[in-house]
Amino acid sequence: MKLSKYVSLAEVTRSDTAKRKGISNEPTPEHLENLKTISEEVFDKVREHFGVPIFISSGYRSAALNKAIGGSATSDHNNGRALDLDQDGHGNGVTNMDVFKFIKDNLEFDQLIYEFGTDKNPDWVHVGYRKGANRKQVLRAIKEGGKTKYVPYK
């Protein structure tokens, strides 16, 4: 099933953990609508801008899957409002930093997170989108005392 021009349902629900543990990762109808919205409003625009495939490393997570991986109970992945994009290592000249900057400077989003990495490039990019209620919050994820901490991106 296609969610948008460039995104399939299989792509955003794919999970090795779900397969391995026999966990259903099927979105509810409401979550499916959210996935369609973020795919059209964010992902497709990133894909069109760069003109190369963009890779989703994490999309939708059912409550059971989120618990199995130790994810945050308040994560927007749980309701189909977030995607993690990891462009590095695909040999098409587009980096995670390129994706991060394009989203930050050009698109509507609720939350954009520069996930770990170095000052020059994040390990991946988390982007959340809420229909009609976007905060444009830009954060950086860092490790502090063995725990993840979110600080304003500078």
Please provide the spans of the model-predicted regions.
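Extracytoplasmic cell-surface/polysaccharide-interacting catalytic and binding patches
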Residues: 1-47, 145-154
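Amphipathic alpha-helical interface surfaces
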Residues: 38-42, 65, 81, 95, ...
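Extended, low-complexity, intrinsically disordered C-terminal regulatory tails
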Residues: 41-70
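A broad, low-specificity signal marking well-ordered, structured residues that form hydrophobic/aromatic
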Residues: 54, 83, 124-125
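Active-site microenvironments of hydrolase-like enzyme catalytic domains
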Residues: 69-85
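Catalytic cores and adjacent binding grooves of peptidoglycan-active enzymes
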Residues: 87-154
